[in-house]
Every structure is written in C-alpha cells, then in structure tokens.
UniProtKB/Swiss-Prot annotation:
Protein name (Swiss-Prot/TrEMBL): Protein Gp45.2
Pfam families (UniProt xref): Gp45_2 (PF17470)
C-alpha cells in the first residue's frame, strides 16, 4: 500500500448538525436532522424553517 498518496485513508460522510435553541429559556442543544424529526414529528418543517415561536434552528460548524 502506498502511504504517500493518501490512498489508505477512509472517508466517512459528515452528519449535518444543528443548534436547537429554546427561545424562552435560551437553552441550546446540538442535534441531527434525524433527532429533530423523531422529537418534533409534525412540527419538524416549522422548526426547520424557524416558523415555530418556541424553537429556532441554526447550522452547527465545528
């Protein structure tokens, strides 16, 4: 195996993360899209488009 070319590196797809913020308490959580879908079900689309008065979602960058 030729290590100088980087051919041995494994690539794993990044899982997109979001910061979920409670607008009343200011509490923040780092979540994935699947976590949001599981937790909010019918409200998911509203929360993702920031049309929910209790929650806002922003992109998380590491």
């Amino acid at each position: 195996m030729e290590y100088s070319t980087g051919q041995h590196l494994l690539v794993v797809p990044e899982i997109k993360k979001y910061v979920l913020t409670n607008t009343f308490s200011g509490e923040e959580h780092i979540v994935t899209e699947q976590m949001l879908k599981s937790a909010f079900k019918d409200e998911y689309n509203k929360i993702m488009s920031n049309r929910n008065s209790a929650w806002t979602v922003t992109d998380f960058y590491e």
